[in-house]
């Protein structure tokens, strides 16, 4: 199964790219994790943040194919590790690839949220999108290792 992490934002700093790559490469069992970067909409002095969000939403929806879609959203469902492992198992058995949507500074466009089959909250805290990429890769690896009986997850 291919998991595409579709995230608003640009290149990751070295520490984030290294962390993301480490966990993405550890995934096995026919799972690949691919990063799709959506350019930030124009923001700044005099710019309309709604217009930036609209641009990001259009680009994100255009990047989607016929795959399961899960939106990362603070108002989504929070899963502990065993629950995430069950979700991953369900996604694996669905037969479709998976897209995880991560918004930019203003979150996800309402149309992206509407397109999502599920909403997942990593935490009630707000994280920088670069850190979210690393957290997602690690949590997916942790859930996969739990499904495989691998000793990485020891809770």
Swiss-Prot record:
Q: Which InterPro entries match?
A: Alpha/beta_knot_MTases (IPR029028), RlmH-like (IPR003742), tRNA_m1G_MTases_N (IPR029026)
Q: Where does S-adenosyl-L-methionine bind?
A: 72, 103, 122-127
Which reaction equation describes what this protein catalyses?
A: pseudouridine(1915) in 23S rRNA + S-adenosyl-L-methionine = N(3)-methylpseudouridine(1915) in 23S rRNA + S-adenosyl-L-homocysteine + H(+)
**Domain of life (superkingdom):** Bacteria
Q: Which residues form a coiled coil?
A: none
Check the record and name the Gene3D superfamilies matching this protein: 3.40.1280.10
Q: Which GO terms describe its molecular function?
A: rRNA (pseudouridine-N3-)-methyltransferase activity
Where in the cell is the protein located?
Answer: Cytoplasm
Q: What is its EC number?
A: 2.1.1.177
- Main localization, broad class: cytoplasm
Say what the protein does: Specifically methylates the pseudouridine at position 1915 (m3Psi1915) in 23S rRNA.
Q: What does the record note on quaternary structure? A: Homodimer.
**Which family does the similarity line name?**
Belongs to the RNA methyltransferase RlmH family.
Q: Do you know which PANTHER family this protein is assigned to? A: METHYLTRANSFERASE (PTHR33603), RIBOSOMAL RNA LARGE SUBUNIT METHYLTRANSFERASE H (PTHR33603:SF1)
The record's HAMAP family line, in alphabetical order, gives:
23SrRNA_methyltr_H
State the protein's name.
Answer: Ribosomal RNA large subunit methyltransferase H
Q: Organism source for this protein?
A: Alkalilimnicola ehrlichii (strain ATCC BAA-1101 / DSM 17681 / MLHE-1)
Gene (name only) = rlmH
């Amino acid at each position: 199964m291919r998991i595409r992490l579709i995230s608003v934002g640009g290149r990751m700093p070295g520490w984030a790219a290294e962390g993301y790559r480490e966990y993405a490469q550890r995934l096995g069992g026919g799972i690949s994790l691919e990063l799709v970067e959506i350019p930030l909409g124009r923001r700044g002095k005099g710019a309309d943040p709604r217009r930036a969000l609209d641009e990001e939403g259009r680009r994100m929806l255009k990047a989607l194919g016929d795959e399961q879609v899960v939106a990362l959203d603070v108002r989504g469902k929070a899963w502990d590790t065993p629950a995430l492992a069950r979700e991953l198992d369900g996604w694996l058995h669905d037969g479709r690839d998976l897209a995880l949507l991560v918004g930019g500074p203003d979150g996800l466009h309402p149309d992206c949220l509407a397109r999502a089959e599920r909403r997942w909250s990593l935490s009630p805290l707000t994280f920088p999108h670069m850190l979210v990429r690393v957290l997602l890769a690690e949590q997916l690896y942790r859930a996969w290792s739990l499904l495989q009986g691998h000793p990485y997850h020891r809770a």
